[in-house]
Amino acid sequence: RHAITSKIDFSKKLIGIAPFAKHKAKTYSLEQMKEVIGSISKEYTILLFGGGKNESKQLKIISEEDKNVFSLAEEFSLSDQLDFISNLDLMISMDSANGHLAAMYGVKVLTIWGVTHPYAGFAPFNQSSKYSILVDKNTYPKIPTSIYGNKSPEEYKQAINSIAPEEIIKKIQEII
């Protein structure tokens, strides 16, 4: 575990990315998230958060592609991960727990919303609405399709992927 810590460049701003959510319609495509990571990893140190065997495996693969990207999944306890989260300059999260945890530490949280909506009451605590990226309401007028994101029409299941990586990159630069 300390081998990872010794490789992390703490002189750069730290961006945490939690690319998963409980429901698929709330999860941005990993391919598009890799574009975001590839664009920002030269300037920032990227820490990846997630849980579960499958997620951890995917994050490990992403981290092995770039010397400034580190997967903390399965490498650190939740308590240790919270220590990292508390030191982030920015957390990028889906509508999921990691964004809420970061917000409780006063970390700026950029949330990416699929079939849910922050106005339904689940925006991270004390965060500007400017830190939320939403799908286009004209294209997907039925959003939110459910409060938790567990129900959505078939044609909405990929709505979150209509958000261009460039939009996320631009928002990161505005916030940080």
Please give the residue ranges for each predicted region:
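Mid-sequence helix-capping/hinge segment at a functional interface
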Residues: R1-K26
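Donor-binding and catalytic core of enzymes assembling or modifying cell-surface/extracellular glycoconjugates
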Residues: L30-V115
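Nucleotide-sugar donor-binding patch of glycosyltransferase catalytic domains
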Residues: S71, A103-I176
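Short, solvent-exposed polar/charged micro-motifs at secondary-structure junctions
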Residues: A3-S6, K57-Q58, D80-D83, P141-S146
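Aromatic-acidic/polar surface patches that form glycan- and anion
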Residues: K26-S29, I160-N161
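Short, basic/glycine-rich phosphate-binding loops at helix/coil junctions
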Residues: L14-I17, I61, P144-K151
